[in-house]
């Protein structure tokens, strides 16, 4: 893996890079793991009941349902992102529950206990809200992301594949969960139910980043080294391009970056692969934002595959969901220290 910014490309918001995504990016945008398709509810979703629920069940790995989704939304708003909000308690949520508990002086069990519910509910804002779909939302353009890099290089922009995907990212949830909340197709003018992630309050202080390779988590610390935010990440494969231990710093930020696939810099690239430039866009291999690091060719960036984050290995760099990478960029500026530990 290598990421070599070019002054000419940067002036056009383009980065020269080798592949920094899981599985060489040669799988289709939607192909990672076969998951059961979410089924729409038989009747309209009861947003009021969801928002007014006061139950505090013990949630642990394997739990599913509305209570899990409520906890995920509150964790997201507290800046301890589970990645996609989907109503399923998996590894990312367990890590973030533990991080949240540590940050709030609770026993770090990794399970949502009664004490954790009490702490999370201090937020008070409704967990779900309504959103009226705009003409801009549905106008696109939307286009299927090709499998092959040379085919991606022919696209003018690596855009979303559908309005469902675009709105899912906007509201930090999986497309399947968005379908659970809303019956029928999404059209301009339609009022839909979405996670109320806009109610998130920015941490008052942030000074450095710590990356825990074993946990696959990026932590944000304040000046007193207290934990104020956490995000799931995917990192480089230990055999091909492992994330190095030690201290780096954020060097620059590029919004809506382009990408150059350079197989000569990849250990696992097909022998017949060609170097190609790929246009910017949310489904670009490095997503919607790039935070360059002082170690040459390395960066923290978004991804076109949010469901993979925290679960897959990459060929280098630090992958986050697009929305989490964008949120991180509001906290982490040039000069921010990035400490990587095993």
Placement of each model-derived feature along the sequence:
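Gly/Pro-biased beta-strand-loop elements
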Residues: 198, 204-303
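Extracellular LysM carbohydrate-binding repeats and other cell-envelope/extracellular binding modules
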Residues: 91-137, 179-208
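N-terminal secretory signal peptides
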Residues: 1-10, 14-28
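Sec/Tat signal peptide C-region and signal peptidase I cleavage site
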Residues: 29-33
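Short alpha-helical segments in extracytoplasmic peptidoglycan/chitin-binding modules
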Residues: 71-75, 85-86, 96-101, 163-171, ...
